Amino acid sequence: AQVNSPGLELIVFSGNSILEVVQRYNLFHGGGALPPLWGLGFWHRVHATFNADQVKEELEDFEERNFPIDVVGLEPGWMTKSYPCTFEWQKKRFPDPATFTRELLDKGIRLNLWENPYISKSSRLYESMYPLSGSHLVWLGLVPDYTLPQARRLLTDQHHEDHISIGVSGYKIDEVDGYDFWLWPDHATFPSGVSGEAMRQSYGLLMQNMLYTDLFKKRN
């Protein structure tokens, strides 16, 4: 990361043990929050090309061996197109995502979807997001300006309708930690006026905050 500032404040946390150092660091930043207990459990991800039946078969193997699974992650093959993303279920692999998700929840298994923030031209969001996006593409996908309320609303409404309303419990946000050659250059522009460099350095946190605040927390 780069900070355009004439000075730098350095804060050092010390303690008698690593635990004490981490405790002081957490308290300095407000104390943190305890995630749901299932979030601290055992996570497993399946292959990107798996369909619903293959996911269930793999989870049954764990069950037969008395190995508890708390969360299963679906790599981006659950979507019609990725990466960039449509955020829409690939119906050949997951013909009935609502039933699939409910069956997992009945077994105490949460569903976590892998995605990145960039919009595929095949997505039904593409046209609406086009004027709300940056000047450069990432892998031919739009880079929405998620500082804009309208862009946030478009994505979170779609996520609620297609994912959260049927029981999806979370997301693995991918490909938000790159540099100028991997994502977009410093001279990229965004509708909000945020610079390309500042947007790139904060994009992952912006996406996380949006999904938590505008989606999970807002809709309980």
Give the ranges of each region predicted by the language model:
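Carbohydrate-recognition beta-sandwich/jelly-roll modules
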Residues: 1-70, 101-103, 107-111
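Aromatic- and carboxylate-enriched substrate-binding clefts and catalytic-loop regions
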Residues: 68-220
